[in-house]
A protein has these predicted regions:
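A generic structural motif
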Residues: 27-32
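Short, well-formed alpha-helical segments that are part of the catalytic scaffolds
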Residues: 11-26
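Active-site nucleotide-sugar/metal-binding loop of Leloir-type enzymes
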Residues: 51-52, 65-77
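Short, conserved SAM-binding/catalytic segment
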Residues: 25, 50-54
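Donor nucleotide-sugar binding loop of glycosyltransferases
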Residues: 11-14, 41, 63
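Cell-envelope/extracellular polymer assembly enzymes that use nucleotide-activated donors
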Residues: 1-3, 33
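A conserved acidic beta->alpha catalytic loop
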Residues: 38-46
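Short, acidic/glycine-rich phosphate-metal binding loop used to engage nucleotide
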Residues: 56-65
Length: 77
């Protein structure tokens, strides 16, 4: 399984395009999951991610922390 982890913080404007591009690229993999690891956004980032079919993990901000949380949430971590 290919797990794609996207760390975010208040990314409602850029996230739809990012998720659409990742979903298109992930279609080439046999199995995939997209995980949005959010650092406490105050906008609609998490709602947008969920509506696109991504799994959402919310935790502390910080790219490394968010990547680790996303990796821990991956189905085959």
């Amino acid at each position: 399984v290919l797990s794609i982890i996207v760390p975010t913080l208040n990314a409602e404007k850029s996230l739809p395009g990012t998720l659409a591009a990742l979903a298109e690229a992930a279609r080439m993999a046999l199995a995939h999951e997209i995980i949005v690891s959010d650092g406490g956004s105050r906008d609609r980032t998490c709602d947008i991610a969920r509506r696109s079919g991504a799994r959402v993990v919310v935790g502390k901000p910080g790219r490394g922390i968010q990547l680790a949380a996303g990796a821990a949430a991956a189905r085959h971590a």
